[in-house]
Each structure stands twice: as C-alpha cells, then as structure tokens.
C-alpha cells in the first residue's frame, strides 16, 4: 500500500477512489480557478457546500476550510442516465477543496472507482473519459 502522505508531498496522490493534488492557492482562489478550468472541459458547478460553515452552524467545532463542489457535464449526465438510470445515484461528480495541517488540497472522486461495481464496459470506458477531463481541470487549477 502506498503512503498517501508521501504521495501528496510529491504533488499528487492517486488512491482507488480519489485523485488529490496540493495547491499553494487560497481555498477561495482554488475554487475560482477550479470553476474556470472545469468550464474549459465542459463542466459546470451545480452547487457548493461549505462544510466549515455548515458544521459551525450546527454547533460543531470545525476550523479547517472544506468546500465540496458538485460538478456536472450535462451531455455526459444525459448519456449515463439514459444508459442506466441507477447510475444517477453516483451523480453529480464531486471535487473537494480543503485545508489540512495548514496546507490546501484539491481532490476529486474518481468516476472509474465509482463505476467499477456497475460491471458495464461502456460505462467504465465513459468513466475513464470523464475522469481524464476532471484530472486535466484539477491539474490546471492547482
């Protein structure tokens, strides 16, 4: 098993379920740049969850910044939903931009991992294409 901390130190961590890069940008700047780079590859932001704000409103002590972007490529979503409506349970794609130990990270849930249990070659291939675009956007935004 790979040591995720050491992979992150080299700039990118690839686990079975996520792709993570460290960024020197502020959380707000990383969110803005991620939004722009996602548009460049055909994705839009459906919503943003600010977990720090949400948890603090619930009376919980949560100090680190943590934003979760819900992202979608409408054409891809349509194609997937027409192929298998239950795959909608895995939508939209999510990208986390967060702070940990005074460092900032961008992390995406890998579509290939999410689709692995579906056992549908066409969807797996499609997931790889989507993942490549999301990784490209992440690399550009970091």
How does the language model describe each region?
Residues 117-142:
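Well-ordered alpha/beta subsegment
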Residues 2-42:
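Terminal, regulation- and interaction-focused segments at domain boundaries
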Residues 44-97:
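Compact, glycine-rich, soluble single-domain proteins
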Residues 89-102, 138-142:
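Short secondary-structure transition/capping segments
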Residues 35, 52, 135:
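Short glycine-/small-residue-rich flexible loop motifs, especially phosphate/cofactor-binding loops
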Residues 94-120:
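Beta-strand/loop substructures that line and gate deep hydrophobic ligand-binding cavities in soluble
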């Amino acid at each position: 098993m790979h040591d995720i901390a050491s992979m992150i130190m080299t700039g990118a961590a690839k686990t079975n379920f996520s792709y993570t890069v460290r960024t020197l940008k502020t959380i707000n700047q990383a969110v803005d740049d991620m939004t722009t780079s996602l548009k460049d590859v055909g994705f839009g932001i459906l919503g943003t969850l600010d977990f720090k704000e949400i948890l603090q409103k619930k009376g919980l002590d949560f100090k680190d910044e943590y934003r979760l972007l819900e992202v979608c490529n409408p054409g891809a979503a349509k194609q997937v939903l027409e192929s298998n409506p239950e795959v909608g349970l895995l939508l939209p794609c999510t990208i986390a931009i967060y702070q940990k130990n005074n460092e900032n990270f961008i992390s995406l849930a890998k579509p290939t991992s999410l689709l692995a249990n579906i056992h549908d070659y066409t969807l797996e291939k499609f997931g790889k294409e989507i993942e490549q675009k999301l990784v490209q956007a992440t690399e550009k935004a970091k």
